[in-house]
Amino acid sequence: MAAKWEKKEGNQGELTFEIGADKISEGIDKAFQRTKKNLNVPGFRKGKVPRQIFNQMYGEEALYQDALNIVLPEAYEEAIKETEIEPVDQPQIDVDSMEKGKPWVLKAVVTVKPEVKLGQYKELSVTRQNTRVYAKDVDAELESRREKQAELVLKEDQPAAKGDTVVIDFKGFVDGEPFEGGESENYSLELGSNSFIPGFEDQLVGVKAGDETEVKVTFPKDYQAEDLQDKEATFKVTVHEVKTKELPELDDEFAKDVDEDVDTLEELKAKIKDELKEQKESAAHDAIEDEALNQAVDNAEIQAIPDAMKEDDIHRQMDQYLANMQQQGIDPKTYYKLTGTTEDDLHKQFAADAERRVKTNLVLEAVVEAENIKPSQDEIAAEVKDLASQYNMEESAVRGALTDDMLSHDIAIRQAVDLIADSAKQNAKAEDKKDDSDKN
């Protein structure tokens, strides 16, 4: 089949291709078989009219449009392969000629992937983050674990302070009327947690068990319930209990309580230091990767990104995000209700960086091509095994869902990222070079 690609302005071009006699005949045969099922012709049972009679009555041309619809998808795909173009959107296809006894000629306006001209992407200069673990880092983590092990004990006839927890009943009113969601009983609220309406917690500092009080607040302008935005409200509050945190002693017993693999506080400190070191090194690697990748993208020349590519990216991000929520037992409807957002809000959230994500992927694909990165069958097999383990699937199910080309593409992209990051020249911050502080 003859196919010709002519690049036009921007990311568009014209794809001219033919559908040959054999395919046309095949399409007409299938179109006739579909058409005759519902055809009533005098002298013949329904659906039994011969082809010759049909042609005499209606002409073979009456089947052309249906035949075209049948053979066009395959013909278009073959034309794409022949011309080696990469469409990113649905084409606009028009019939150029459809004459009996001749190949059908079609012209398609096609939007293709933007061209990428790579700049420097290897040996880029990046900043290495400080990965030292200091005594203060270990102390902060120990304090965090103490907070998690804290017990709430009743404060007898003592006023509530910030950091204390009050157990309250409350009922809210706007313009003298109660509102939906504004009432609760035996609600535990940590003062200073900023988990309630701004100003609410501050007005409970100083209350005691048994107190009844009123709290006056103004709902934020961006409050999730639109009917309450910027509204003044009064809450009637009854205080049942005031509790304060009692932190455990920082000793060997505490260490054994928070980590069954250690016997002493010193062992816990050493383990925390190792964990923090691993976290910092992982974060530093990610930062180098991000900085190097951003430079590689900035150094490249990339044609304008088609809207279709940005939309595809946005919907992929949304699907992945909602799938992750689903794995946590939160379906999309529940997610939107809990967050007070809509599908449009989520779309806008991912739209903000869609163009950058698409550009990054285009640059990585260009690096894969420039470096001739081709994952081996062993690497593909290992990827299948990892995915099967990650998603608790059979390897055969992974193979059924993903082709080798798809798996190879994902592996190659990751290898391109590694190449860019690993070749980068890492420079320590000036203050890190001078820093001779306690490394614990």
Curated annotation (Swiss-Prot):
Its EC number is 5.2.1.8. Involved in protein export. Acts as a chaperone by maintaining the newly synthesized protein in an open conformation. Functions as a peptidyl-prolyl cis-trans isomerase. This is Trigger factor. Residues 163-248 form the PPIase FKBP-type domain. It is found in: Cytoplasm. Keywords: Cell cycle, Cell division, Chaperone, Cytoplasm, Isomerase, Rotamase. One of its GO terms (molecular function) is protein folding chaperone. Signal peptide: none annotated. It holds the Pfam family Trigger_C. Consists of 3 domains; the N-terminus binds the ribosome, the middle domain has PPIase activity, while the C-terminus has intrinsic chaperone activity on its own. HAMAP family: Trigger_factor_Tig. It comes from the Bacteria. InterPro entries: PPIase_dom_sf (IPR046357), PPIase_FKBP_dom (IPR001179), Trig_fac (IPR005215), Trigger_fac_C (IPR008880), Trigger_fac_C_sf (IPR037041), Trigger_fac_ribosome-bd_bac (IPR008881), Trigger_fac_ribosome-bd_sf (IPR036611), Trigger_fact/SurA_dom_sf (IPR027304). It catalyses: [protein]-peptidylproline (omega=180) = [protein]-peptidylproline (omega=0).
